[in-house]
């Protein structure tokens, strides 16, 4: 009977059924999920070579799912009916596939987020370094006092909002942008040149006052006829022409005495010498005091106010009155 049944069904010898440890074959026979016994080995090879869409490891065959369910049933301590229901199988397969896909997407998103975080950190670090460098340059320039501190650049990499300056002047110069960063002294030069404004026009009277009060060289050369050595006098140290006349007397009185013999008659004439120096300003004595102005013209001392004389006098001379022209003396007398 057994041989007849085997011939009728066309089955190969059931050698593996005699092995008690081969539970997978028994499971296939029990559930009927294996291949039909009439199918040959060629059909199995064709099924293995079938092309399937999807990532490796995420799509599983029905046989693999059945084997997995069977192993879980054998390992679990709870009682079972030797197979799992269909809905549990489908839910488990869907959860595994979706979980795997979610895990893959999460890893990709984590990598992209980590890359973006690294880029932002690098930009923030570069911005902090530039901000520190600009602060150091500004402090050094303030200590030197050569130029005002530069305004904070707007084109630098973004810095945190709490470190960003809140107030800026209306007339702030345009920032100097570039990469690699421009050195601090070049940035200061560019900002100072762009922040310079045109000077405001001033009145002629104001310019005249400045030239009168701000004379750089108050020392003036003075020479006297008959004395080969000249002297220098500070006009700013005196407030009137009388003080200037007494100063000229002190400068050249000793030279005049050295040129003459020291006799009793000469000593008696000392009062006459004082009178000569006293009449320097009006031109009625033996000597007359004149000066050269900024244009090189020879003028008589005492014609203009004292401040104008101090600002325009370039050189003084004590000349003999006999050498002066009569016209100049006559004009002085009329004045």
Swiss-Prot record:
UniProt tissue specificity: Highly expressed in roots. Expressed in shoots and flowers.
Induction pattern: Not induced by auxin.
Gene3D superfamilies: Phosphatidylinositol 3-kinase Catalytic Subunit, Chain A, domain 1 (3.10.20.90)
Record has Glycosyltransferase as a keyword: no
One Pfam match: AUX_IAA
Disulfide bond is among the record's keywords: no
Gene Ontology terms describing biological process: auxin-activated signaling pathway; regulation of DNA-templated transcription; regulation of translation; response to auxin
Domain PB1: 217-321
Motif EAR-like (transcriptional repression), residue range(s) on this chain: 51-55
Subcellular location: Nucleus
InterPro entries per record: AUX/IAA_dom, AUX_IAA, PB1-like
SUPFAM superfamilies: CAD & PB1 domains (SSF54277)
Family to which the UniProt record says this protein belongs: Belongs to the Aux/IAA family.
PANTHER family: AUXIN-RESPONSIVE PROTEIN IAA17 (PTHR31734), AUXIN-RESPONSIVE PROTEIN IAA26 (PTHR31734:SF2)
Function: Aux/IAA proteins are short-lived transcriptional factors that function as repressors of early auxin response genes at low auxin concentrations.
Designated name of the protein: Auxin-responsive protein IAA6
Species of provenance: Oryza sativa subsp. japonica
Taxonomic lineage of the native organism: Eukaryota, Viridiplantae, Streptophyta, Embryophyta, Tracheophyta
């Amino acid at each position: 009977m057994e041989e007849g049944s085997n011939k009728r069904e066309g089955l190969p010898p059931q050698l593996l059924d005699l092995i008690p440890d081969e539970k997978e074959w028994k499971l296939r026979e029990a559930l009927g999920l294996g291949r039909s016994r009439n199918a040959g080995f060629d059909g199995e090879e064709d099924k293995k070579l079938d092309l399937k869409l999807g990532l490796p490891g995420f799509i599983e065959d029905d046989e693999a799912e059945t084997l997995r369910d069977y192993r879980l049933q054998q390992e679990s301590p709870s009682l079972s009916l030797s197979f799992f229901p269909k809905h549990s199988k489908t839910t488990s397969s869907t959860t595994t596939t979706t979980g795997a896909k979610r895990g893959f997407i999460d890893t990709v998103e984590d990598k992209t987020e980590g890359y973006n975080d690294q880029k932002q950190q690098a930009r923030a670090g570069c911005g902090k370094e530039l901000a520190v460098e600009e602060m150091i340059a500004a402090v050094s320039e303030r200590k030197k006092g050569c130029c005002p501190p530069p305004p904070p650049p707007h084109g630098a990499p973004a810095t945190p909002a709490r470190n960003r300056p809140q107030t800026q002047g209306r007339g702030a110069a345009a920032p100097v942008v570039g990469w690699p960063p421009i050195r601090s002294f070049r940035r200061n030069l560019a900002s100072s040149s762009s922040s310079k404004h045109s000077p405001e026009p001033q009145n002629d009277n104001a310019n005249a006052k400045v030239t009168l009060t701000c004379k750089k060289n108050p020392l003036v050369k003075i020479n006297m006829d008959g004395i080969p050595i000249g002297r220098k006098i500070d006009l700013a140290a005196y407030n009137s022409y009388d003080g200037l006349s007494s100063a000229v007397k002190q400068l050249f009185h000793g030279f005049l005495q050295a040129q003459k013999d020291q006799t009793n008659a000469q000593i008696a004439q000392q009062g006459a010498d004082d009178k000569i120096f006293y009449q320097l300003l009006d031109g009625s004595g033996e000597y007359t005091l004149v000066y050269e102005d900024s244009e090189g013209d020879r003028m008589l001392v005492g014609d203009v106010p004292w401040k104008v004389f101090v600002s325009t006098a370039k050189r003084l001379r004590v000349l003999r009155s006999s050498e002066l022209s009569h016209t100049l003396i006559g004009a002085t007398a009329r004045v």
